[in-house]
Amino acid sequence: MRHRKAYRKLSKPTPQRKALFKALLISLFKHGKIVTTLPRAKEVTRIAEKLLTIAKEDSVHHRRLVYAWLQDRELVRKVFVEIAPKYKDRNGGYIRILKLGMRRGDAAEQAVIEFV
């Protein structure tokens, strides 16, 4: 059963929400850290942690699972060759969320997501 397997919907339809998460994940893996709102940061962290756990073991199947989210072969190579080996001995907690305070325009709480 999938009881209590909740996630944040962020007031967006499913395809738009998935596209948003893909874009944030691509930026995170490409640049190493990103600034976004706190609810988005928490959801992207959940997905990114799962992708890094998958990437710790290199196989064609795992590369295809990561590619489904990142859609960029060079970025998938970077995840498997550069990023994931750093966390071989670590069980989760690959990403840190730092709160930045409120955004001036709409008072949304900002956060930085970065690799530990």
UniProtKB/Swiss-Prot annotation:
Gene source species: Dictyoglomus turgidum (strain DSM 6724 / Z-1310)
Subunit-structure text: Part of the 50S ribosomal subunit. Contacts protein L32.
Gene Ontology MF: a single term: structural constituent of ribosome
Recorded GO CC terms: cytosolic large ribosomal subunit
Family note: Belongs to the bacterial ribosomal protein bL17 family.
SUPFAM superfamilies noted in UniProt: Prokaryotic ribosomal protein L17
PANTHER family: LARGE RIBOSOMAL SUBUNIT PROTEIN BL17M, RIBOSOMAL PROTEIN L17
Signal peptide range: none
Pfam families named in the record: Ribosomal_L17
Gene: rplQ
GO biological process: translation
InterPro entries documented for this protein: Ribosomal_bL17 (IPR000456), Ribosomal_bL17_CS (IPR047859), Ribosomal_bL17_sf (IPR036373)
Record's protein name: Large ribosomal subunit protein bL17
Domain of life: Bacteria
